[in-house]
């Protein structure tokens, strides 16, 4: 793996994500932002510095009676090859994460066991299944033995980089990307042990061009299954690949969500699985003080923000707007009044979004103005205040309580207290606010931003 690993190590993240075709928008322009699941997953993976430091709850559903029930507290307990263990430690993993403790004995069991795992990015699940992939390779056989499917080029590259780093001392293991831009000599069979790529490319190589024998695959990994379902065509391609595999092939299925659509998909792919659900600590309103401010219009909303900043010391704050136009208008006004402001909307490329988030997380900008493009899963530990310049509503104009929770749940985390401020302009938005209050059964207090005394109270 030496040459490939060096090549992968030399690639910069910015070069990888820069290949995303996000600069040119096709079709009708819209002022509303919708988070793309593949882009969001990529952002979370790249932004994650090691494992997420949140409380985790694990739900193990044992379906296969032959699957091991024990967990491990050290990597040594897995009896790995010395070269693989060395790679794990070189990556900075000292002890298994919570999902690794439980998943690895099943992933590495002999005979192989199938698994469905629900776990968000930052929990160590990629390292877990990559370890299983590397462990299963028989270097004496010069043909593909492991298939790992990702929904996009960029997510496949991310997985490949993990495999390269973990397998850097396993020099005999050969890995290849099956993604756009990768060409193959159709007169020769593929000899690399591990193929990581997108469904369409792997379908072409394995079935259309018959460059490797699908029946000889011993491990099949389907990663980011929820994103796969959301990507047109991938669902059917995955099923076509699965049908060509040996019934004894180990099937590993990973998803960040656990809805009915995902599980229906999983049941088509995985027989007799051990099911692991690992949930991050849910956003909670317990440590968050919620307020609403009555304003006459958009200018009144801006004046309310100005009054708040004029009376109390606000550290890091996120302001959510309904449209890109409103976000741009608000950013221009706040910047002209001397605030250090960053803007994050769907008009930015992934590279630009990474830069904005890195600058905000490092404190270079104190205010981040965004839309629903900043979806769940991206944590900012030092966040103190969330302002809903526009309350979240669904397509029917009704209160979107789930989005509200994910928005303000970014503050009041890690045992700290937070502040959420909702700006109200009319009876319609007041009803939305009231519906949110009833849904969570948590009082949203009125705040008079024309009173310095009232504002100072929320800062204590």
Swiss-Prot record:
Positions of modified residues (Phosphoserine): 26
Cysteines engaged in disulfide bonds, as pairs: none
GO cellular component terms attached to this protein's record: cytoplasmic stress granule; nuclear pore cytoplasmic filaments; nucleoplasm; nucleus
Residue positions of motif DEAD box: 223-226
Record's signal peptide: none
Molecular function per GO: ATP binding; ATP hydrolysis activity; mRNA binding; RNA helicase activity
Catalysed reactions, as listed in the record: ATP + H2O = ADP + phosphate + H(+)
InterPro entries: DEAD/DEAH_box_helicase_dom, Helicase_ATP-bd, Helicase_C-like, P-loop_NTPase, RNA_helicase_DEAD_Q_motif
Domain Helicase ATP-binding: 106-276
Protein name: DEAD-box helicase Dbp80
Organism name: Drosophila melanogaster
